[in-house]
Amino acid sequence: MLFSVLLLVAILSYFWGVFSLNDQKKSIDKFVNKFQPQNQLDQKYQDMLIRLDIDSGSLNALAGIFARSGEFNKAIAIYLIALQKALTKSQKELIFLNLGKAYLKAGFIQRSIEVFLEAIKISPKNIDALSHLGLGFEKLRLHDKSLEVLDALQEQGVDVAQEIAYTKALKLKNSQMEFDQKVAKMAKFANDFKLVSRMILELFIINGKDINLINIKPDLADCLDILYLNDAILDGDEYKELYSAKGQNQTPINNFELKLLKTAKQNKINATLSFSYVCNKCKGTYPLFFYRCNHCARLGSCVIIPNLIKENDEECISF
């Protein structure tokens, strides 16, 4: 009797496993078919990769090569094929994660969110998937959802104090709240994310407010571009070198670029400053200031680089 029961349990367990695998395969096929029409990989190459005896791990590696070279459409197509060939949950989880990153890099934000959620279904504590899911919500300005993800990361012991401060400040900045109340609330997050002070300076300038009413003033290194291009003068010893370079006082200058600018003006050379912006982590260079690097997603990594140029000219002055 006992043997019969054990045999029945074993048989049921076997068929349950078969049905479960079939359900998973149908789910994967349905997911892949949803995105398949947008693939940019030639159909003959897709068919070849499907037919050949190439495992999901090898396809995942191949897709990664295309992703690293910026060919995201090809990478996405191969990840989708790899997903169909994945046999284990861990394989599927990894491919979902990499596929989501490719969609995110390619600018398909909503799709990336859907894919990261699939990875999280398999492993709810996947820190990498949660982090990138939060980035997707941030790009779509879904600040509340982004904060929910950050809370989940914090519960796992991840230090996200800076990200939480930035997200809450960003939510306030984009809100319709009354100006003084908005600024006061934003200032509370400056200790956890120091560039909140730059965000507040931007708000003052955009709204035509007196910038000397700011309680928490940003470091000059974090706002050199804004102050140089703005006519208003921000009080404080830290800023005197900048205004000396602009000819508005006689403070001695230590900063090399500012000293060059002042020397050029004293010698009647038509000179001004332009600015480029470099990520101190990945060294990516951008034409505009950023709070989060678009390439490596590092928060607060922007370094402002002043360049001396001929006024009304893009050509740098060499000395």
Residue ranges and their predicted role:
Residues M1-S27:
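N-terminal signal-anchor transmembrane alpha helix of single-pass membrane proteins
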Residues D53-I54, L87-S90, P124, V158, ...:
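Short coil turns that delineate tetratricopeptide repeat
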Residues I216-F319:
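Cys/His-clustered metal-coordination modules, chiefly Zn-binding fingers
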Residues S58, K92-I95, A129, Q162-I164, ...:
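TPR alpha-solenoid repeat register
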Residues Y45-Q46, Y79, F116, L150:
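Hydrophobic/aromatic packing residues within the alpha-helices of TPR/SEL1-like helical repeat arrays
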